[in-house]
Amino acid sequence: MSARRNFEWPELLTADGRGIAFGGDYNPDQWSEDIWDDDIRLMKQAGVNTVALAIFSWDRIQPTEDRWDFGWLDRIIDKLGNAGIVVDLASATATAPLWLYESHPEVLPRDKYGHPVNAGSRQSWSPTSPVFKEYALTLCRKLAERYGTNPYVTAWHMGNEYGWNNREDYSDNALEAFRAWCRRKYGTIDALNQAWGTTFWGQEMNGFDEVLIPRFMGADSMVNPGQKLDFERFGNDMLLDFYKAERDAIAEICPDKPFTTNFMVSTDQCCMDYAAWAKEVNFVSNDHYFHEGESHLDELACSDALMDSLALGKPWYVMEHSTSAVQWKPLNTRKRKGETVRDSLAHVAMGADAINFFQWRASAFGAEAFHSAMVPHAGEDTKLFRQVCELGASLHTLADAGVQGTELAHSDTAILFSAESEWATRSQTLPSMKLNHWHDVRDWYRAFLDAGSRADIVPLAYDWSSYKTVVLPTVLILSAADTQRLADFAAAGGRVVVGYATGLIDEHFHTWLGGYPGAGDGLLRSMLGVRGEEFNILGAEAEGEPGEIRLSSADDSAALDGTTTRLWQNDVNVTGEHAQVLATYAGEEADEWELDGTAAVTRNPYGSGEAYFVGCDLDVADLTKLVRAYLAASSQENADVLHTVRASADATFDFYLPRGKKTVELQGIEGEPVILFQTDREEKPGSYTVRRNGVLVVRR
């Protein structure tokens, strides 16, 4: 396992190189050069100090195979630098020029049906194509040779959103690479046959040259889940290897500037194993796009909580988010008054030290013409650009106050996230195809906020032993080693909360035997003090069947009375001598499924700690009741406010952001205000009125 790269933050063109980075993707090659000076004038007006440049510019840099044109890039980098704006220079490989596809159509990826993924969009290339890699690395070296010592280029932006369009490649190149990957991973074909369970449906292989990728096999056919899980791992690894090849090609020439690439962690996107990717960058970056509705801020904070963990508590970079509406959803909602500033400051509240947008100037043409930007189609005399300017001033104020470099204070609760469990929940072979690990992580996160607490989101593979409580929502895959870690954590005094559909399979997608949840050859069952025989899956597939089952509290708290489950119920027996049943299934619907009186939520002492089993799905409101009663009963936080703390040895900053539509009255706030965005300071010391989408930041 490779060591993590050193943390290195790109410098700005300030006297000390410090400050909160602010800007966006800049695509000057979409515009005539007579626009560039006006762009820079507006950038200075808005307080922009950094741009990401040349992300989709390969065809402008290399118009034909034997011709290179750096002149336009030289000119814009000089203009930006002379204006005090640094460049995060892209490797420009996100989209290849059409001449390359015409000359070498074999570089195109293929879908599971064998069709080529044609050029014309982004990432229409196979990460396993040696031909494409040769051209891409030549480009990287050319860029490094020309700009490696340029003082205005302070960071390298590798690729763009790796995996957006080529996460799964079914080409012949991919097939050969997958066979080699399997050989490296398993060593022998017998070990691979064992891992994939190929005796089922007669899939045994005699050699690695018989290994297949999970191409289309017929409309009603199901892919071997072990094979598909390894193909997901392979796709992640191939893209990571491609990123590292690009990075290393530049680093050989320009080793002294930091490298990053933009992850995709937001509403419905967490497609890569970013716990592995985070080790290979000098600073972590993310593209975050907002979730419409009442959970807008909560989802942002949840995604950012994972980013903070991936960054190991170091500052991280918002590489892209939107000033207002995007253009790629069926319905694209704009942001309300204040949300452009509020969302950006919320990212800072969650540990970000850089706020960039897609993009600087709204495109006049192309697929993203109606995607919002810092400068909208209507120009500078707009509400949106004025908000951008207000944001720039706020970020400058925060930087002057000393926020940059402070670290986000952690919770005592960790919600564990597993990319492999996220991939596994997509399998067609599970009792329900409605499982979604990342959504369940988000629901638990919101429940802690609603209970007046806050949790961290931590990759399962990381060290979470310092927390008091760990929560596992739909963590389908648990290895024996990870199960032992959980048992050791509980035995040492920790609290483990295991959600439904957790610990059902091992890392090869083999079911753990002996009863559910069986992870660790029954160690998880022993820790929980329960043993499940079957799952009850609701879905109203048969007319007249109940769509939900009610729970009834089984202890004096009555906390879970009236809560309901609508998808998945574990039918378990309580086996622990000292296990306590906290809630049971109850009522006519439970009786219909022979679950009436069966344990739904339990608690079991284990060593010096305890383990909870939440054996059914619950919505956010019902999870909140559970969290408030058993997991965060002592919390004193105001559930109407997202409150975070960033601190260093020199200063502590408190951020307060209302979570809903209502104005929030805050009292007893210590410290001096730094930011009063849509916030009024009242006469009474420590009292503030924070309006909808407002932000209060105080230093103490």
Curated annotation (Swiss-Prot):
Known catalytic reactions: Hydrolysis of terminal non-reducing beta-D-galactose residues in beta-D-galactosides
Listed SUPFAM superfamilies: (Trans)glycosidases, Class I glutamine amidotransferase-like
Enzyme nomenclature, EC number: 3.2.1.23
Binding site for substrate: R122, N160, W328, E368, A369, F370, H371
Listed GO CC annotations: beta-galactosidase complex
Active site: E161, E320
Superkingdom of this protein's organism: Bacteria
Keyword Membrane in record: no
Activity-pH dependence: Optimum is pH 6.0 using PNPG or TOS as substrate. Not active below pH 5.
Gene3D superfamilies according to UniProt: 3.40.50.880, Glycosidases (3.20.20.80)
InterPro entries: Beta_galactosidase_Trimer, Class_I_gatase-like, Glyco_hydro_42, Glyco_hydro_42_N, Glycoside_hydrolase_SF
Free-text activity regulation comment from the record: Inhibited by high substrate concentrations (100 mg/ml). No effect on activity with various EDTA concentrations (0-1 mM). 20-fold higher activity when cells grown on TOS than when cells grown on galactose, glucose and lactose.
GO biological process, one term: carbohydrate metabolic process
MF annotations from Gene Ontology: beta-galactosidase activity
Post-translational modification as stated in the protein's UniProt record: The N-terminus is blocked.
Thermoactivity: Optimum temperature is 50 degrees Celsius using PNPG as substrate. Optimum temperature is 35 degrees Celsius using TOS as substrate. Stable at 40 degrees Celsius. Half-life time at 50 degrees Celsius is 10 minutes.
Membership in a protein family: Belongs to the glycosyl hydrolase 42 family.
Chain's role: Involved in the hydrolysis of transgalactooligosaccharides (TOS). Highly active towards Gal(beta1-4)Gal and Gal(beta1-4)-Gal-containing oligosaccharides. Low activity towards Gal(beta1-3)Gal, lactose and Gal(beta1-3)GalOMe. No activity towards Gal(beta1-6)Gal, Gal(beta1-4)Man, Gal(alpha1-4)Gal, Gal(alpha1-3)Gal(beta1-4)Gal, lactulose, 3'fucosyllactose, lacto-N-fucopentaose I, lacto-N-fucopentaose II, cellobiose, maltose or sucrose.
Quaternary data: Trimer. Tetramer.
Protein name: Beta-galactosidase BgaB
Gene: bgaB
